[in-house]
C-alpha cells in the first residue's frame, strides 16, 4: 500500500517535471512532507522558507498571483494556527489559488505534544470563502486531487 504523502510527492514531482509553473513551498518540513527528491531534482521550483509559516503563505500567494501553481506544504497545525490571518487574507479573501497540504492533522503528531496538534483545522478553514477542504483516504484519491 502506498502512503498518501508518497502519492502526493510522486504525483507532484511527475507533474512539475512537465510544468515549470508548479512550485512547492515548505517550512522546514521537506522531510515530513517527503519533498526531498522534489527539492533535489527541481530546485528552481522549490522554495524553503524555514520555520516561517506566515511568510510561506504570503510567498505562495504572491507566486499564485503571478500565475504559478503553488502547493504550500507542512504540518497542518502551523498553517491553521500560526498563519491563519495570511491564509484568510492572502489566500481566501484575495482568491489566490494555492493548495495547502497540511500533514498530520488531529493528534497524529502525538509525541511532539500539544503544539503540534491540529484539532480545529477543518472547523476553522471551512468558514473561509472559496476554501475547499479535502481529506483523501488513500493514495489513489490523493493522486487524483493533485492532478
Task: Tell me the role of every PLM-derived stretch.
Residues 1-147:
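Thiamine diphosphate
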Amino acid at each position: 500500500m502506498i502512503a498518501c504523502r508518497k502519492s502526493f510527492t510522486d504525483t507532484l514531482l511527475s507533474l512539475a517535471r512537465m510544468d515549470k509553473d508548479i512550485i512547492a513551498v515548505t517550512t522546514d518540513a521537506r522531510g515530513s512532507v517527503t519533498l526531498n527528491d522534489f527539492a533535489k531534482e527541481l530546485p528552481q521550483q522549490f522554495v524553503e522558507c524555514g520555520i516561517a509559516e506566515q511568510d510561506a503563505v504570503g510567498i505562495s500567494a504572491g507566486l499564485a498571483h503571478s500565475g504559478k501553481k503553488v502547493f504550500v506544504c507542512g504540518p497542518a497545525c502551523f498553517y491553521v494556527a500560526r498563519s491563519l490571518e495570511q491564509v484568510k487574507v492572502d489566500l481566501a479573501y484575495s482568491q489566490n489559488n494555492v493548495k495547502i497540504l497540511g500533514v498530520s492533522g488531529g493528534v497524529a503528531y502525538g509525541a511532539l505534544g500539544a503544539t503540534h496538534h491540529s484539532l480545529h483545522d477543518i472547523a476553522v478553514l471551512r468558514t473561509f470563502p472559496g476554501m475547499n477542504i479535502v481529506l483523501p483516504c488513500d493514495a489513489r484519491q490523493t493522486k487524483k486531487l493533485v492532478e
